[in-house]
Amino acid sequence: MGGGRVAHPVLKGPSVVKELVIGTVLGLAAGGLWKMHHWNEQRKTRAFYDLLEKGEISVVVDEE
C-alpha cells in the first residue's frame, strides 16, 4: 500500500517588494483619478463664476 508521493508546491509568504509595488501603483492611480476629478470640479466652478461676473447668468430667479 505504499503509494507514490505527490509533489505539492511549497507555499511561500507574501513578497514584501511585490506588495509595496502594487500598493504604490494603486495609490498613484487612485491619487491621479482624484486629482483629475478635482481639476474638473475646479474648472466648472471657475467657468460658473466667470459667467456670473460677465452677467450672462444670475443666481437670482427672475420674477415675471
From Swiss-Prot:
Keywords: Membrane, Mitochondrion, Mitochondrion inner membrane, Transmembrane, Transmembrane helix. Its main location: mitochondrion. It is found in: Mitochondrion inner membrane. The keyword Transferase does not apply. GO terms for cellular component: mitochondrial inner membrane. It comes from the Eukaryota. The chain crosses the membrane at residues 15-34. Belongs to the cytochrome c oxidase subunit 5C family. This protein is one of the nuclear-coded polypeptide chains of cytochrome c oxidase, the terminal oxidase in mitochondrial electron transport. This is Cytochrome c oxidase subunit 5C-2. It comes from Helianthus annuus.
